[in-house]
């Protein structure tokens, strides 16, 4: 870009940077280039303009043309030669300019600006080209010695990066030129280039301290070394970097083959062609020739130099560990064939540094809990400690298929039950203390289900239920497992029995023998006594039963089919319940009217005293009939007082089952007083009121008094005003026309004869 440097006189100070496409006026007042304290300077003394003469910005040999035009009174001098007023002149770098006749002297210089972009996307390249164009520079794709900057978003080791480091050129971000352009336009201080260095994006060398600034040591890094390339593509790609570093690059093929001593000379580095790489396409005959050279080097104790070591030697500024045929290869970094460049048009590999070294050791992700054992990931892989919990999960995953197979193949019901119980006992983990209350709750719930089952046994099964097709039909494996589990729950969760109940149990067992040797007997005498006591206490716990009825219905429905099957299987062994059930039927008949009254009270809030009296009379009549049928009911009533003392020990959360008929028994229970059928003394029961409207009490009018509203009164006045103004305007025009006609009349006044 062009710069106007003050040489002497009152125009001293910072240089003026000239952007392309902008006219810079040199003058005394209100100018871009202001020269004060010089009386020979005009207000618009001269104009400087820089423009490109070619459209191709890649032509680095063409620089922008800077033209100077003189508009002054006292003249402008270029190299002590006065310019003609009103004419332009092309300037060259190094020309001296004197404005006026005094000491306002300047010098013109051109500062080269050639930016080479690498690894930029399309939008980044477009923004870079626009900024470089305004600054008067060029953008190129391939690195040359004329390049002044390497533009990268993040530093990746490519051929361009190596060449820029060897040449000592700065590597900057694209934002540097954007900020530079803004600073020139606003005449502010230029940005510091150190703050626009891109970060290093090479995982293999990211942890090491790397100096990517311009160092003089890199310019002679390969001095005294000769790099032998056995492949034309490698030579074309890497020869420029070797030459920039002071070395010599030679291409050796089968046609111009040298002697073996040439490859063994000191300072000679044979570049590895990477024939083991599948991406490198080399003919078989050439592979044999290359392999013979590699075998010769190996016999002499030498090694080929990988491509990556050329870049590493430049980055770390040493050839002791890199590019040494007699030394050992570097163990810190793996050297593989690099990937292709993003900016070169040729299909050659540009990137020298590999990605992160691939380790074949597989590491397991840390997905365990905090209590689980942890492990460290270091340079050398260690054994991974697996927690006990994870081992148990693995044991369970192995045992699960065997359990499923046993469930499918077994046909015996006992084996099916054992398998299902085995599935429940598979988790052998130690339970935490927070889970123990839930287990206790499950036990209490099981005991409540057992008590509920005993109450359900109190009622006979309804005859409306569907009968089984076959009495001795084999049960399915799932149902047998459920029966076995329910039996185990009943046996394990039976509640404690009071002493009073135990005495009565012994009394009943002496009077009525029971078959206790049967295997399927699930309901003992204790259950029968508890059902009798529970039935006696139903009237006292009716309110609590209603509140818990909905909650228990969900738990009881699960056991319906199991209980129904058990009732059929245990029919011969439960003959003792026949007598008790007959007595309980009488009690049920006696209590049903009372329960009906209570349920009617809960559902209807507006109960009438007359309906309650009728229900009480029916209840008293039924009680007299029941007294004559059995004596056990009266004994039970006398025992209610004793049972009230033990009401605390009675089971709670029981299920109340009622058998209701769909026929309305008490038709007089409806409230006749709630409906008043006599409308004789009442007025019209309609609550709305007719709204009066204009003309409601008169004859209908098509157009009536208040319906007429002067809607267009305002519009008429405006129209009249407009018409009046128009008439005045027309009259005025008529008067003007008549006056004009009178001016041109020869004899406006006519004389009439008398």
Curated annotation (Swiss-Prot):
Domain BRCT stretches:
105-181, 224-315
SUPFAM superfamilies this protein is in? BRCT domain, SMAD/FHA domain
Record keywords: Amino-acid biosynthesis included? no
Q: Which family does it belong to?
A: Belongs to the Nibrin family.
Report whether Cell cycle shows up as a keyword of the record: yes
Query: Could you state a single Gene Ontology molecular function term?
Result: damaged DNA binding
- An example of a Gene Ontology BP annotation on this entry? blastocyst growth
* Biased composition range(s): Polar residues: 328-346, 431-440, 447-462
Q: What is this protein called?
A: Nibrin
What post-translational events are described?
Phosphorylated by ATM in response of ionizing radiation, and such phosphorylation is responsible intra-S phase checkpoint control and telomere maintenance. Phosphorylated at Ser-432 by CDK2 in S/G2 phases abolishes interaction with TERF2, enabling DCLRE1B/Apollo recruitment to telomeres. Phosphorylation at Ser-432 in response to dysfunctional telomeres promotes non-homologous end joining repair at telomeres, while dephosphorylation by PPP1CA promotes microhomology-mediated end-joining (MMEJ) repair.
- Which parts of the sequence are annotated with region: Interaction with MTOR, MAPKAP1 and RICTOR? 221-402
